[in-house]
Amino acid sequence: MTKVLNKYSRRLTEDKSQGASQAMLYGTGMNDNDMHKPQIGIASVWYEGNTCNMHLNQLAQFVKNSVEKENLKGMRFNTIGVSDGISMGTDGMSYSLQSRDLIADSIETVMSAHWYDGLVSIPGCDKNMPGCMMALGRLNRPGFVIYGGTIQAGVMRGKPIDIVTAFQSYGACLSGQISEQERQETIKKACPGAGACGGMYTANTMACAIEALGMSLPFSSSTPATSVEKVQECDKAGETIKNLLELDIKPRDIMTRKAFENAMVLITVMGGSTNAVLHLLAMASSVDVDLNIDDFQEIANKTPVLADFKPSGKYVMADLHAIGGTPAVMKMLLKAGMLHGDCLTVTGKTLAENLESVADLPEDNTIIHKLDNPIKKTGHLQILKGNVAPEGSVAKITGKEGEVFEGVANVFDSEEEMVAAVEEGKVKKGDVIVIRYEGPKGGPGMPEMLKPTSLIMGAGLGQDVALITDGRFSGGSHGFIVGHIAPEAYEGGMLALLENGDKITIDAINNVINVDLSDQEIAQRKAKWQAPKQKATRGTLKKYIKTVSSASTGCVTDLD
């Protein structure tokens, strides 16, 4: 008996009572034969205004061509996206994190309303990645992700530069390290074309996580956007989705607890973004996998940082592609017993089977350190708790900035206030910069603090100050930084009670973040505190404030 592959779409295409549905489909150009084909949603996060996304419609066409070669019907549709790089440092960043959930909602909506049988998602930028994955998890129909790919490095005066060079150029100009002419040259040459920001920033971090989860094809995360190999990956989409339909392999068969452990190990080895904590928690929630913030610390305790990627290192993802790509790194980790090789993937094979034919990393490569010579012996993503963050916080500690910082609070109620203080020379060595009311509800949208961290680094203060916030950090942020502090200030968390001059200790060895105040002093301040007004009174951000959960649970919007 032939297996039914159009088990969803046939509800519309083969039911005589759905004549209007069929009339509209005939109107799109479908014929009698098409009406019996499985329909595959092709969700492209395309828009022109961002290097990460500008080429995705072209990739979607390649995917559609591949799908239709397999006697399937490809149905392209679009969803929204927000460029973190463009909105960074402005109120527009409030829309970034919530775009993740809007992407998931919109893909779920189109797929469910139109009864598509499978899904190929094509994300390009930071929040695109988990948004597409959350939709796949909720729907639990055969599907996978094709990453839009990484950008090539820019070149200025013979040296490689990237988006973070552009971010840091303003601080460097303020401090006299570069001229205005050099700053202008930097911003014009940092992004040479299509592709996501090139270092181990959030998009590449999440692409690695998705590949380790088994939800993208091998090499997807490290293949550059404009390469022949990215087109070849799209050409495999048809046979891949048809195989998933025939074997009835669904996301929840792949996105298991062990698969999430693989993802956490890989992003740690790669020196990935703090945003991975939020996004993996949200992705796990979409498939009902029990994952919590403390699981990241368990992985960090036994997993080294091996990759020398920007922002704290010197290489970009295209460099890894040239020496074997992400699968070569995973093969090394599998040999060392650090990955679960028996996890199922979208190829229909296990992770170990996918890696059998992959070449080893070159012995003399300088991008990925050997296990006996790590950049940092334990993970860089550290979960800190204490009276400043009872529910937890996420620190990005590579080791280059030290592991303990003691200083005095310099408190700001917004990112803009802090930026002005740096410009006016009011941030000094020994400060623990506190940026509060920038959490999921308070921000709203938990905006990223790349502009402040870039100013700090550009001004030469990276080794001398720390920054803590209930907001997030870009994958491009580095320095002594702690974000995701929960509870957030807007909900009366400890950040709301801090005052200038308070002594704060950040200890990434013992995973503690504390302020030197007695319980009585904290209670007295709490009694005087008044909640601020919501920053959004209408529209999508108003709804986000009402529905978003704490950073410690992934900032999801569909919890009970």
Curated annotation (Swiss-Prot):
EC number(s) on record? 4.2.1.9
Keyword Transferase attributed? no
Q: Which GO terms describe its biological process?
A: isoleucine biosynthetic process; L-valine biosynthetic process
Record keywords:
2Fe-2S, Amino-acid biosynthesis, Branched-chain amino acid biosynthesis, Iron, Iron-sulfur, Lyase, Magnesium, Metal-binding
Which reaction does this chain catalyze?
(2R)-2,3-dihydroxy-3-methylbutanoate = 3-methyl-2-oxobutanoate + H2O; (2R,3R)-2,3-dihydroxy-3-methylpentanoate = (S)-3-methyl-2-oxopentanoate + H2O
Q: Which residues are recorded as modified (N6-carboxylysine)?
A: K127
Q: Does the keyword NAD apply?
A: no
Catalytic residues, per the record, are S474 (proton acceptor)
Q: In which pathway does it act?
A: Amino-acid biosynthesis; L-isoleucine biosynthesis; L-isoleucine from 2-oxobutanoate: step 3/4; Amino-acid biosynthesis; L-valine biosynthesis; L-valine from pyruvate: step 3/4
Note how many cofactor molecules are bound and how. Binds 1 [2Fe-2S] cluster per subunit. This cluster acts as a Lewis acid cofactor.
List, alphabetically, the Pfam families matched. Answer: ILV_EDD_C, ILVD_EDD_N
Q: Which InterPro entries match?
A: DHAD_IlvD/Edd (IPR050165), Dihydro-acid_dehy_C (IPR042096), DihydroxyA_deHydtase (IPR004404), DiOHA_6PGluconate_deHydtase_CS (IPR020558), ILV_EDD_C (IPR056740), ILV_EDD_N (IPR000581), IlvD/EDD_N (IPR037237)
Which family is this sequence assigned to?
Belongs to the IlvD/Edd family.
Q: Quaternary structure?
A: Homodimer.
NCBIfam families the UniProt entry points to: ilvD (TIGR00110), PRK00911.1 (NF002068)
Q: What does the function comment of this entry state? A: Functions in the biosynthesis of branched-chain amino acids. Catalyzes the dehydration of (2R,3R)-2,3-dihydroxy-3-methylpentanoate (2,3-dihydroxy-3-methylvalerate) into 2-oxo-3-methylpentanoate (2-oxo-3-methylvalerate) and of (2R)-2,3-dihydroxy-3-methylbutanoate (2,3-dihydroxyisovalerate) into 2-oxo-3-methylbutanoate (2-oxoisovalerate), the penultimate precursor to L-isoleucine and L-valine, respectively.
Cross-referenced HAMAP family: IlvD (MF_00012)
Full protein name = Dihydroxy-acid dehydratase
Lineage of this protein's species? Bacteria, Pseudomonadati, Pseudomonadota, Gammaproteobacteria, Thiotrichales
Q: Which gene encodes it?
A: ilvD
